Amino acid sequence: MIQKPRGTRDMLPDEMERRREIEARMRARARLYGFREIATPVFEELELFTIRSGEGIINEMYVFEDKGGRSLALRPELTAPVLRMYVEEGRSLNKPVKWCYFADCFRYERPQKGRYRQFWQFGAELIGADSAMGDAEVITLGYDLLRTAGVTFVLRIGHLSFMRTLLADLADGDKKKIRAFLDKREEEAAITYLRDIGRDDLCDPLIRLCGARTLEDVFAIIGEIPEAARVREMFAILDASGIPYEINPAIARGLDYYTGVVFECFAEGLGAENQILGGGAYRLAHLFGGEDTPSAGFAIGFDRVMVALGEASWVPWQPQVMIITTNEGRDYALTIAGQFRMNGIITETDLMDRSFSAQMKAAGKSADYAVIIGKDEVETGTITLKDLKAGTQEKITADEAIQKLTSA
């Protein structure tokens, strides 16, 4: 038997309905902030991702060569493709550009709870707004989307200038190592590395900075920095908006293109793989042939959102109807089915030439109502509507049934 590839999933109708409901909530919420949905190719030129994505992601990419000898990759993330699209298609648009997307991404990593090799992401990118207000809106949108989805989570915010200032006199390679440790939340490994390279003087400040939870504590450790006024303004805007958050200077992010504010959200009940959102401010457009354009955005791991929701996610109830008929009532039944569907009622008819009793038995397993059509219903232009849960039935017109079912 041929099975699905490791790290992928099949999703049956119940799961897909739950997912589509949460997606719809998130799409609608993003639209309220002025973000419009876009789509990019599933595969891109390999160079798009090797320019600035970070070693961890580069090593996990699905890479192939096409028949023309071009090196291509299945997208491991969406920010780089979106900025490539902006440079190629959207530079003439009014700023700021507000785009969002749902899309599959692909990474060759070890599958585990909430982590797959093919995974579904929601993301949003704000392009061309270089302000504390812009940074705050992106964070607020991310928070609002998860809240709307029904997830219980914690929002943590940092700024790369905090750690960049503390580690300013380290070699670039050493900075990268420290950032990689912090991104994996391995602070002890970062301390050990500093000792190994003879920088014991940075160990205590790093420990204190990683543990700082107020801006006052942060600036007491690193001193005032050029970004201080904007950082304070951004947090003041979040406070005014009523957004709950924790300050965490240790946030590093695994992608090499972030330049300023960074933020992450962590859900309850997911164990070690509990990060469901990550984002920040970045500059990428100039790497793809455009102008140096300030941007900010985030991605939500939608699969982890669904795991975090568990059975808490719900699909609005809609009555389901099965039409039960004899051969002489078939044409009339098809007309009724068409009328029901035109009015948004989920309606099925028998496709297996079953007997009347077998049709009723099947309806009892999958439907909420049975519409019974026999010789009498055809002659009188009516239907018999049976509530399969209550066991009651009544003979009414199709219009009356539609009114009853659409108001249920």
Curated annotation (Swiss-Prot):
Pfam families named among the record's database cross-references: HGTP_anticodon, tRNA-synt_His
Per UniProt, the enzyme's principal EC class comes to ligase
Q: Which GO terms describe its molecular function?
A: ATP binding; histidine-tRNA ligase activity
Cited InterPro entries: aa-tRNA-synth_II, aa-tRNA-synth_II/BPL/LPL, Anticodon-bd, Anticodon-bd_dom_sf, His-tRNA-ligase, HisRS-like_core, HisRS/HisZ, HisRS_anticodon
Which GO CC terms are listed, alphabetically?
cytoplasm
Localization of this protein: Cytoplasm
Q: Which UniProt keywords apply?
A: Aminoacyl-tRNA synthetase, ATP-binding, Cytoplasm, Ligase, Nucleotide-binding, Protein biosynthesis
Q: What is its EC number?
A: 6.1.1.21
Q: Which reaction is catalysed here?
A: tRNA(His) + L-histidine + ATP = L-histidyl-tRNA(His) + AMP + diphosphate + H(+)
Q: Which GO terms describe its biological process?
A: histidyl-tRNA aminoacylation; L-histidine biosynthetic process
Q: Which SUPFAM superfamilies match?
A: Class II aaRS ABD-related, Class II aaRS and biotin synthetases
Q: Which family does it belong to?
A: Belongs to the class-II aminoacyl-tRNA synthetase family.
> What NCBIfam families is this protein classified in?
hisS
* Database matches in PANTHER family: HISTIDINE--TRNA LIGASE, MITOCHONDRIAL-RELATED, HISTIDYL-TRNA SYNTHETASE
Q: What is this protein called?
A: Histidine--tRNA ligase
